[in-house]
Protein backbone atom coordinates (compact mmCIF):
# COMPACT_ATOMS: atom_id res chain seq x y z
CA UNK A 1 0.00 0.00 0.00
CA UNK A 2 1.39 3.40 -0.94
CA UNK A 3 1.73 6.27 1.50
CA UNK A 4 -1.19 8.07 -0.18
CA UNK A 5 -3.37 4.95 0.02
CA UNK A 6 -2.62 4.64 3.75
CA UNK A 7 -3.49 8.30 4.28
CA UNK A 8 -6.73 7.85 2.34
CA UNK A 9 -7.62 4.85 4.50
CA UNK A 10 -7.06 6.96 7.63
CA UNK A 11 -9.32 9.69 6.21
CA UNK A 12 -11.96 7.08 5.34
CA UNK A 13 -11.89 5.65 8.88
CA UNK A 14 -12.26 9.11 10.40
CA UNK A 15 -15.11 9.98 8.01
CA UNK A 16 -17.04 6.87 9.04
CA UNK A 17 -16.78 7.78 12.72
CA UNK A 18 -17.71 11.44 12.10
CA UNK A 19 -20.72 10.41 10.01
CA UNK A 20 -21.82 7.88 12.64
CA UNK A 21 -21.66 10.58 15.35
CA UNK A 22 -23.73 12.87 13.10
CA UNK A 23 -26.32 10.15 12.63
CA UNK A 24 -26.34 9.47 16.40
CA UNK A 25 -26.91 13.17 17.06
CA UNK A 26 -29.90 13.12 14.72
CA UNK A 27 -31.26 10.02 16.45
CA UNK A 28 -30.91 11.64 19.89
CA UNK A 29 -32.77 14.68 18.57
CA UNK A 30 -35.58 12.23 17.74
CA UNK A 31 -35.45 10.65 21.21
CA UNK A 32 -33.58 7.56 19.97
CA UNK A 33 -30.06 6.20 19.97
CA UNK A 34 -27.93 3.16 19.28
CA UNK A 35 -26.71 3.53 22.88
CA UNK A 36 -29.07 4.34 25.75
CA UNK A 37 -27.45 7.72 26.47
CA UNK A 38 -28.20 9.36 29.82
CA UNK A 39 -29.23 13.03 29.92
CA UNK A 40 -25.67 14.32 30.43
CA UNK A 41 -24.41 12.23 27.51
CA UNK A 42 -27.26 13.46 25.31
CA UNK A 43 -26.41 17.07 26.12
CA UNK A 44 -22.70 16.45 25.44
CA UNK A 45 -23.53 14.83 22.10
CA UNK A 46 -25.74 17.74 21.07
CA UNK A 47 -23.18 20.34 22.16
CA UNK A 48 -19.90 18.67 21.14
CA UNK A 49 -20.93 16.16 18.49
CA UNK A 50 -19.58 13.17 20.42
CA UNK A 51 -19.68 11.60 23.89
CA UNK A 52 -16.51 11.36 25.96
CA UNK A 53 -15.64 7.82 26.99
CA UNK A 54 -17.06 6.33 23.79
CA UNK A 55 -15.18 5.30 20.66
CA UNK A 56 -16.31 4.44 17.16
CA UNK A 57 -15.67 0.73 16.59
CA UNK A 58 -15.31 -0.48 12.99
CA UNK A 59 -17.40 -3.65 13.22
CA UNK A 60 -15.76 -5.07 10.09
CA UNK A 61 -12.06 -4.46 10.67
CA UNK A 62 -10.56 -2.00 8.21
CA UNK A 63 -7.46 -4.19 7.83
CA UNK A 64 -9.55 -7.01 6.34
CA UNK A 65 -12.47 -5.05 4.89
CA UNK A 66 -11.09 -1.71 3.63
CA UNK A 67 -14.12 -1.29 1.36
CA UNK A 68 -16.19 -0.48 4.48
CA UNK A 69 -13.67 1.90 6.05
CA UNK A 70 -15.70 5.05 5.23
CA UNK A 71 -19.15 3.62 5.98
CA UNK A 72 -21.02 4.95 9.02
CA UNK A 73 -23.00 1.69 8.87
CA UNK A 74 -19.77 -0.06 9.92
CA UNK A 75 -19.52 1.89 13.20
CA UNK A 76 -20.86 1.12 16.65
CA UNK A 77 -20.16 3.17 19.76
CA UNK A 78 -18.40 1.38 22.59
CA UNK A 79 -16.56 2.38 25.74
CA UNK A 80 -12.79 1.91 25.57
CA UNK A 81 -13.07 -1.32 27.58
CA UNK A 82 -15.84 -2.71 25.38
CA UNK A 83 -13.91 -1.70 22.25
CA UNK A 84 -10.91 -3.71 23.48
CA UNK A 85 -13.19 -6.62 24.41
CA UNK A 86 -14.74 -6.59 20.92
CA UNK A 87 -11.28 -7.12 19.44
CA UNK A 88 -10.23 -9.72 22.01
CA UNK A 89 -13.10 -12.19 22.21
CA UNK A 90 -14.92 -10.51 25.07
CA UNK A 91 -11.83 -9.87 27.22
CA UNK A 92 -10.33 -6.46 27.90
CA UNK A 93 -6.71 -6.85 26.82
CA UNK A 94 -4.65 -3.66 26.65
CA UNK A 95 -1.60 -5.56 25.35
CA UNK A 96 -3.35 -6.93 22.26
CA UNK A 97 -5.11 -3.63 21.66
CA UNK A 98 -7.25 -3.37 18.56
CA UNK A 99 -5.18 -5.68 16.36
CA UNK A 100 -7.52 -8.68 16.34
CA UNK A 101 -9.83 -8.75 13.33
CA UNK A 102 -13.55 -8.17 13.91
CA UNK A 103 -16.47 -8.98 11.63
CA UNK A 104 -19.69 -8.28 13.44
CA UNK A 105 -21.70 -6.40 16.00
CA UNK A 106 -20.31 -6.68 19.55
CA UNK A 107 -22.96 -6.84 22.26
CA UNK A 108 -21.44 -5.18 25.34
CA UNK A 109 -24.10 -6.72 27.61
CA UNK A 110 -23.54 -10.36 26.64
CA UNK A 111 -19.93 -9.94 25.44
CA UNK A 112 -20.84 -11.81 22.26
CA UNK A 113 -19.89 -10.99 18.69
CA UNK A 114 -22.73 -11.38 16.19
CA UNK A 115 -20.98 -12.12 12.91
CA UNK A 116 -21.89 -10.43 9.65
CA UNK A 117 -20.30 -13.33 7.76
CA UNK A 118 -19.95 -12.38 4.11
CA UNK A 119 -22.68 -9.74 4.37
CA UNK A 120 -21.96 -6.01 4.50
CA UNK A 121 -22.11 -4.32 7.90
CA UNK A 122 -25.30 -2.62 9.02
CA UNK A 123 -25.79 0.11 11.56
CA UNK A 124 -26.74 -0.94 15.08
CA UNK A 125 -30.46 -0.79 15.76
CA UNK A 126 -31.79 2.50 17.12
CA UNK A 127 -34.08 2.38 20.17
CA UNK A 128 -36.12 4.90 22.10
CA UNK A 129 -33.97 6.44 24.82
CA UNK A 130 -35.02 5.67 28.41
CA UNK A 131 -34.80 9.35 29.31
CA UNK A 132 -34.96 11.41 26.10
CA UNK A 133 -34.07 15.06 26.58
CA UNK A 134 -34.76 16.39 23.09
CA UNK A 135 -37.71 14.46 21.63
CA UNK A 136 -40.52 16.93 21.03
CA UNK A 137 -38.33 19.71 22.41
CA UNK A 138 -39.72 22.32 20.02
CA UNK A 139 -43.27 22.04 21.36
CA UNK A 140 -42.34 22.11 25.03
CA UNK A 141 -39.87 24.97 24.56
CA UNK A 142 -42.17 27.10 22.46
CA UNK A 143 -45.22 26.64 24.69
CA UNK A 144 -43.82 27.04 28.18
CA UNK A 145 -40.35 28.61 28.13
CA UNK A 146 -38.83 31.97 27.35
CA UNK A 147 -36.99 33.28 24.33
CA UNK A 148 -33.57 32.22 25.64
CA UNK A 149 -34.58 28.56 25.64
CA UNK A 150 -36.18 28.96 22.21
CA UNK A 151 -32.85 30.27 20.91
CA UNK A 152 -31.06 27.32 22.54
CA UNK A 153 -33.52 24.94 20.87
CA UNK A 154 -32.88 26.59 17.49
CA UNK A 155 -29.13 26.32 18.01
CA UNK A 156 -29.39 22.62 18.90
CA UNK A 157 -31.75 21.93 16.02
CA UNK A 158 -29.41 23.48 13.49
CA UNK A 159 -26.46 21.58 14.96
CA UNK A 160 -28.41 18.31 14.73
CA UNK A 161 -28.97 18.53 11.00
CA UNK A 162 -27.57 15.56 9.11
CA UNK A 163 -26.97 16.40 5.49
CA UNK A 164 -25.96 13.18 3.76
CA UNK A 165 -27.72 9.87 3.17
CA UNK A 166 -28.27 7.82 6.27
CA UNK A 167 -30.57 5.22 7.70
CA UNK A 168 -32.32 7.76 9.92
CA UNK A 169 -36.04 7.38 9.39
CA UNK A 170 -35.61 4.00 7.71
CA UNK A 171 -36.05 0.65 9.38
CA UNK A 172 -32.64 0.12 10.99
CA UNK A 173 -33.60 -3.21 12.52
CA UNK A 174 -30.84 -5.77 12.45
CA UNK A 175 -31.86 -8.01 15.31
CA UNK A 176 -29.20 -6.76 17.73
CA UNK A 177 -30.37 -4.67 20.64
CA UNK A 178 -27.95 -2.34 22.42
CA UNK A 179 -30.20 -2.38 25.48
CA UNK A 180 -33.33 -4.12 26.52
What annotation goes with each model-predicted range?
Residues 1-55, 62-179:
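Nuclease and nuclease-like effector domains acting on nucleic acids or nucleotide cofactors
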Amino acid sequence: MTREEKLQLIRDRQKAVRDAWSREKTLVWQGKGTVNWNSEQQRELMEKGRVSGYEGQHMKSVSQYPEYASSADNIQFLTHEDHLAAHNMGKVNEQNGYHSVTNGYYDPETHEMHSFGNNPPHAPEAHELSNPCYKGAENSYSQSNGNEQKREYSKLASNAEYSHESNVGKNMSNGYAMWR
